């Protein structure tokens, strides 16, 4: 599912909301999560999961096509850990 499909599904389930308002809400939520992560904060949505950032050290990698060694710079990457309720729902089937 892509963002536009998510917006459409939320709008379909909430006919009292305009599609453009749902899109603004979804964008605002994603912007706030992104801003928090860029500050190094952790974002926890109980039952869903937690977004955080992890530091990856510089390392020597390998080009899969040529086999040549390449230097990979250190970087910060986003990380998501699922919550207990989400793991249980995924393992017990999905409700629509």
Swiss-Prot record:
InterPro entries: Hist_DNA-bd, Histone-like_DNA-bd_CS, IHF-like_DNA-bd_dom_sf, IHF_beta. The keyword Transcription regulation applies. It comes from the Bacteria. GO terms for molecular function: DNA binding; structural constituent of chromatin. It holds the Pfam family Bac_DNA_binding. The keyword Metal-binding does not apply. Keywords: DNA recombination, DNA-binding, Transcription, Transcription regulation, Translation regulation. GO terms for biological process: DNA recombination; regulation of DNA-templated transcription; regulation of translation. GO terms for cellular component: chromosome; cytosol. SMART domains: BHL (SM00411). Belongs to the bacterial histone-like protein family. This protein is one of the two subunits of integration host factor, a specific DNA-binding protein that functions in genetic recombination as well as in transcriptional and translational control. HAMAP family: IHF_beta (MF_00381). Heterodimer of an alpha and a beta chain. This is Integration host factor subunit beta.
